[in-house]
Amino acid sequence: MEAIKGSDVNVPDAVFAWLLDGHGGVKPLEDNDVIDSQHPCWLHLNYTHPDSARWLASTPLLPNNVRDALAGESSRPRVSRMGEGTLITLRCINGSTDERPDQLVAMRLYMDERFIVSTRQRKVLALDDVVSDLQEGTGPVDCGGWLVDVCDALTDHASEFIEELHDKIIDLEDNLLDQQIPPRGFLALLRKQLIVMRRYMAPQRDVYARLASERLPWMSDDHRRRMQDIADRLGRGLDEIDACIARTGIMADEIAQVMQESLARRTYTMSLMAMVFLPSTFLTGLFGVNLGGIPGGGWRFGFSLFCILLVVLIGGVTLWLHRSKWL
């Protein structure tokens, strides 16, 4: 493949444009640099910036359909061979489990053995690990190594997110054993996060597996082996997600049962109170509506005797409920 001039790739408002030095480090791309397989270029763009958008729309280095894909709407993870290059769409986790579950950041990239063009709208936090290694001189030395390191960082962030969700589920299960109900909507949000993760990480695992099996010229056997390890690791994370989704379903049933039992206990308590006070209410009502006058109304001990009668009646009903094992 022909070498590329640095001036053809330099974009003024690029997030960064670096030339890999072949020893694990990078240097800023300059116009007089020569880009080839020994010194590939990594161009990282925010496709909403005007200069980046114009470069994507006009550069002859990219096929026409690749230009649209790099600046298009978010899509599910996929990999496509485009002539001498490969178009890859990946998803990564940004932030914590308290954020919206569907806020997965899309990163699109087109690469061959000479240069890498990656685009995003929001910052991809997982790239910070790769950038840090390159700046310290311990990063990838070629395009294949770069892709493996990026996929490894994305999988690390996904695994950490899955582990956080798993810890939350364990805490919920422990609280349910103590009859503690989570706040309204908490379990639904947790379940949605798991489902969204499952939706995007399953095709991403397939992307990794395909990259491990494809005979791409810029990937060595060691790169393919590492990529297969990453696919297997993400596959284990998907198994954990499936288990967590099943556990949230069980917890939802358990929460419904706990709430139903709590309501039943309250209803039972109110029914017992009604049974205890129903006879006394009947007597007070009967005496109160007596049109011929209240019996014992002219006797000074009448009210006291009536109160004693009510206490004895309530005590008798309570004793009967206790012996009947209703209390």
From Swiss-Prot:
Superkingdom of origin: Bacteria
GO molecular function, one term: cobalt ion transmembrane transporter activity
Localization per Swiss-Prot or TrEMBL: Cell inner membrane
Parts of the chain on the Cytoplasmic side: 1-273, 322-327
Its membrane topology: Multi-pass membrane protein
Entry GO terms, CC: plasma membrane
Reactions catalysed, as given in the entry: Zn(2+)(out) + H(+)(out) = Zn(2+)(in) + H(+)(in)
Pfam families, per the entry: CorA (PF01544)
Keywords recorded for this protein, A-Z: Cell inner membrane, Cell membrane, Ion transport, Membrane, Transmembrane, Transmembrane helix, Transport, Zinc
Spans within the Periplasmic topological domain: 295-300
Chain ranges passing through the membrane: 274-294, 301-321
PANTHER family the UniProt entry points to: CORA FAMILY METAL ION TRANSPORTER (EUROFUNG), ZINC TRANSPORT PROTEIN ZNTB
NCBIfam families hit by this protein: PRK09546.1 (NF007092)
Protein task: Zinc transporter. Acts as a Zn(2+):proton symporter, which likely mediates zinc ion uptake.
Family assignment from sequence similarity: Belongs to the CorA metal ion transporter (MIT) (TC 1.A.35) family.
HAMAP family, per database record: ZntB
Name of the protein in its database record: Zinc transport protein ZntB
Lineage: Bacteria, Pseudomonadati, Pseudomonadota, Gammaproteobacteria, Enterobacterales
Gene this chain is encoded by: zntB
